[in-house]
């Protein structure tokens, strides 16, 4: 399917989430792409699926949503990825990630190699960099991305794929670094999350990596944004949680759109992202249907 020329690329895993409520398309970079698309931003998913029924169905779903599949390669031997997700009584999800799958070997398609030269930004995560093949592909994209394009690094530490040194290297040169409070605490001090330390951790990470914008999410407590040396905090609002799968990805999509649009204050950008993330937490799965017009 050919869609409008995308302004953003999302590099990384695309897979199936095996949830108690059913099978849902997932993978953080794909989830972000879905929400960018639903919120009116052009995007190209850069990933891989297998030559199997699950891969066929993923592509069919994306095309049905109007997403361009030209950046999704087909791996001849490896299967389409999936994770087994368990949701707790309060809606929090934990994951068992299956290894040696198609998204571990992302091949950059001709469409990706053409569009990266005019992209406004590249969103990439840490999980897909568990393979050296993908790490090389990511560096290939970063090397030819326009100088003024945003480099958005979405940390996703999932044991055993949680190398702090790799995360620090990938964060260097990023325009925006996004991670949760537990990940920030681990990277900064090696300790557990502690409420109230988000600003200090964000400033430490900004100084360590040189990243000018650091966002730390803290679940239902809210989220913080460090930008141009100024710290902003937006408290979470109570919602009826169905599950939290994809809420952080929807948050990131909204934050990126708002910050890149440069029409709202940084505090307003953060608040908008929180509200959209909260709405997704009231829905099942990472890719809920948006209201007509995509407005929330």
Q: How would you name each of these model-derived features?
A:
Residues 80, 217, 244:
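Ser/Thr-centric signal marking residues that sit
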Residues 1-9, 61-64, 69-74, 89-231, ...:
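Ribokinase/PfkB-type carbohydrate-kinase core domain
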Residues 15-17, 129, 158, 183-185, ...:
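A short, flexible beta-alpha/helix-coil linker loop
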Residues 17-92, 97-103:
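Substrate-binding N-lobe of the ribokinase-like
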Residues 6, 17, 38, 44, ...:
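Conserved post-catalytic alpha-helical subdomain immediately downstream of the catalytic base
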Residues 12:
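Active-site beta-alpha turn of Rossmann-fold NAD(P)-dependent dehydrogenases/reductases
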Residues 29, 33, 55, 81, ...:
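A general structural signal for well-ordered alpha-helical segments in protein cores
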Residues 25-29, 134, 248:
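Short, conserved glycine- and acidic-residue-centered signature motifs
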């Amino acid at each position: 399917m050919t869609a409008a020329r995308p302004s953003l690329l999302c590099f990384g895993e695309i897979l199936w989430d095996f949830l108690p409520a059913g099978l849902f398309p997932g993978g953080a970079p794909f989830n972000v792409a879905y929400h960018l698309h639903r919120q009116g931003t052009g995007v190209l998913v850069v990933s891989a699926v297998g030559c199997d029924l699950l891969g066929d169905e993923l592509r069919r779903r994306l095309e049905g949503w109007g997403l361009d599949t030209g950046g999704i390669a087909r791996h001849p031997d490896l299967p389409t990825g999936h994770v087994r997700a368990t949701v707790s009584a309060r809606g929090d999800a934990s994951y068992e990630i299956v290894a040696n799958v198609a998204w571990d070997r992302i091949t950059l398609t001709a469409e990706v190699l053409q569009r990266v030269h005019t992209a406004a930004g590249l969103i990439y995560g840490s999980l897909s960099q568990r393979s050296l093949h993908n790490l090389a592909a990511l560096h290939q994209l970063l090397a030819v991305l326009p100088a003024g394009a945003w480099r958005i690094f979405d940390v996703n530490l999932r044991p055993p794929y949680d190398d702090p040194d790799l995360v620090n290297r990938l964060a260097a040169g990023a325009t925006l670094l996004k991670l949760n409070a537990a990940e920030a605490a681990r990277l900064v001090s090696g300790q557990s999350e502690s409420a109230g330390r988000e600003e200090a951790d964000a400033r430490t990470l900004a100084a360590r990596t040189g990243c000018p914008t650091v966002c730390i999410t803290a679940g239902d407590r809210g989220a913080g944004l460090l930008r141009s040396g100024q710290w902003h905090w937006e408290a979470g609002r109570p919602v009826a949680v169905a599950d939290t799968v994809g809420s952080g990805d929807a948050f990131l999509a909204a934050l990126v759109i708002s910050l890149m649009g440069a029409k709202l204050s940084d505090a307003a950008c953060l608040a908008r992202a929180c509200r959209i993330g909260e709405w997704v937490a009231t829905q099942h799965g990472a890719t809920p249907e948006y209201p007509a017009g995509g407005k929330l």
